[in-house]
UniProtKB/Swiss-Prot annotation:
This is Thiazole synthase. Pfam families: ThiG. It comes from Cytophaga hutchinsonii (strain ATCC 33406 / DSM 1761 / CIP 103989 / NBRC 15051 / NCIMB 9469 / D465). 1-deoxy-D-xylulose 5-phosphate binds at G159, A185, G186, N207, T208. Pathway: Cofactor biosynthesis; thiamine diphosphate biosynthesis. GO terms for molecular function: thiazole synthase activity. HAMAP family: ThiG (MF_00443). Its EC number is 2.8.1.10.
Length: 258
């Protein structure tokens, strides 16, 4: 059965999206991403040498033939994000964009007001916008209404590896959304990625948990397998949760004859 994910003009077989930060080397990053099976990777514009011919990150990403999703990490408001997006489109030749606006450098919480403002402007400018946001069901609907191709609510703070601390809100967002929901930030273990997929998320984005693992290549593969398992479980429909016990084996009536 085909179970591809379609976002705007692209179709993906893998539902694991990945980041490129924090890896020790470009080569290590490449092998981890390859092992994960990821087809879409996000990269911060500030990490790319636009004028350079041999940028390390881009060299390895092009070798893997990944789809690039530039992000506006570092932008503090809508104006800066739109400027960064324009540079990214010119430098990388893609209108796809992960919109990130977080003015607080300590906790990196996304600014909902500036994000909505920037999203509306960028969609009108022809960008395929995937906004990183709080797990706010109302905000997600507003972003959907202005034309975002997907929404990317956080599971917990960026790089925290705390997992799905926003689970209750993620469930509401997934239930109400008419665009793909990609759980982004805070996923620290393959089991947490599987959990997000079991909830019905269209995809997850993972970076830190892979990049700082003891064996990044093995962890990449583990995340790829976990996402597949979680998606399969969701499609198979999980058994209902019950407070009562239910025997898995039938009662044996012959015992009554003893």
């Amino acid at each position: 059965m085909s179970d591809q994910l379609k976002i705007a003009d692209k179709t993906f077989t893998s539902r694991l999206f990945t980041g490129t930060g924090k890896f020790a080397t470009g080569e290590e990053m490449f092998h981890a991403l390859q092992a994960s099976g990821s087809e879409l990777v996000t990269v911060a514009l500030r990490r790319i040498d636009i004028d350079g011919q041999e940028d390390d990150i881009l060299k390895w990403l092009k070798k893997g033939n990944f789809n690039l999703l530039p992000n506006t990490s570092g932008a503090r408001n809508a104006k800066e994000a739109v400027f960064a997006a324009t540079l990214a489109r010119e430098a990388l030749g893609t209108n796809w964009l992960k919109l990130e606006i977080h003015p607080d450098p300590k906790y990196l919480m996304p600014d909902p007001i500036e994000t909505l403002k920037a999203a509306e402007e960028l969609v009108k400018a022809g960008f395929v916008v995937l906004p990183y946001i709080h797990a706010d069901p109302v905000l997600c609907k507003r972003l959907e209404e202005v034309g975002c191709a997907a929404v990317m609510p956080l599971g917990s703070p960026i790089g925290s590896n705390k997992g799905l601390r926003t689970r209750d809100f993620l469930e509401i967002i997934i239930e109400q959304s008419n665009v793909p929901v990609i759980v982004d930030a805070g996923i620290g273990a393959p089991s947490q990625a599987a959990e997000a997929m079991e909830l019905g998320a269209a995809a997850v984005l993972v970076n830190t948990a892979m990049a700082v693992a003891g064996d990044t290549k093995a962890m990449g593969k583990a995340f790829g397998m976990a996402v597949e398992a979680g998606r399969m479980a969701h499609l198979a429909k999980l058994a209902p949760v019950s407070n009562a016990a239910h025997a898995s084996s039938p009662l044996l009536s012959f015992l009554n004859d003893l």
